[in-house]
Amino acid sequence: MVSCMTTYNFDKITNRKGTNCLKYDFAVERGKPADVLPLWVADMDFPVSEEITKSLHAAVEHGIYGYSQPKDAYYNAVMNWMERNHNWKTEREWIVKTPGVVFALGAAVKAFTDPGDAILIQNPVYYPFTNIIRDNDRRVVDNTLIYEKTAGQSGDNGYRIDFEDFERKLEQEHIKLFILCNPHNPVGRVWTVEELQQLGEICLRHHVIVVSDEIHNDFVYSGYEHTVFATVDPRFAEFTVTCTAPSKTFNLAGLQISNIFIPNEKLRKAFQTEIDKTGYDEPNALGIVACEAAYRAGEDWLDQLRAYLLQNLNFLREYLQEKIPQIHLVEPEGTYLVWLDCSQLGITGKELDQFIVDKAGLWLDGGSMFGPSGAAFQRVNIACPKATLELALNKLKAAVDNLE
């Protein structure tokens, strides 16, 4: 592992406007005011690590961007990262490359189910899960997470799995595929080994394939530990597709490269067949370079980033408790996305979404996007300089203070 002594300044504000940035440059195109402050989509307002930048500079200066494929150094970096950070010893042949996790979800849906089949998800959940299922003519079956509002203390999230309903739905709907979000976006749960074991045993009994979206696996707060679902029991690895990417961890979403781990050869071949049908073959040339550099030498940057995100989380918690007590923080165990319970404002989900934009001047992700149970919530991205977060909270406070 390469050690970097660079101290990163995450307080520095980088102007992202005018860079074709989805987060900042497309407000009007998406029906928002031009001056809205965005804390929605899950990328970060921080420049990448020095090692990634240097590696990309070298690749760009070479001047030729032809068809590319990863070599041993790439695979070794990916596998070493998983073993070092997630206690998972993987094999090169398990890895299937895709341009993104959502792309991989679509391939899995087509590989392992047929039109009309039911696929189970756990709302409120990352909204592309629902879209991918419906867009491929499958049916969404929802095992809604149970939410019990807590006192707002660190370490008390309030969300849990309804295991009885989970198994009942698998039986009644003849579920073939379950899409797990681990860590969970947007509610911030980092599922325990015991919870994952129970899910796995149920899926094993009912012969259900699990696609585990673990893209947020490197963001877990102190006191919690991410467990790769496929490592809980060797039997589970045989029916699991594990989706990972450097995009969330190292802010590389625009370079479009993901690593999908499929130990079972039969499942892997079926998945690869669906990838082949799309015509996708060679990954983004610069994505290969950035991913290798990130996993090989990005740990120091990531450690500093995690510390900064924790400071932002603590600041947000204290701000809400002291100045906007009507809005409740659902304590995240992981991810840099926080889930705000706005039910005490006494307005409908649709009214809440309009209030956030029109009165607070903010662009957040409205909770209804994540399923009906999310209507009273808003998702906020705290991976930004503290000054940006403070400005957003000040705008939110002013709007709540004036709410009639």
Segments (PLM) and residue ranges:
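A glycine-/small-polar-enriched, mobile loop at the entrance of the PLP active site in fold-type I
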Residues: 38-43, 57-75
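Short secondary-structure boundary segments
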Residues: 63-72, 78, 161, 292, ...
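Short clusters of hydrophobic/aromatic residues that line enzyme substrate/ligand-binding pockets
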Residues: 13, 65-67, 229
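An N-terminal-biased, well-structured beta-alpha scaffold segment characteristic
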Residues: 17-34
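PLP-dependent class I/II
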Residues: 2-4, 8, 31-37, 42-58, ...
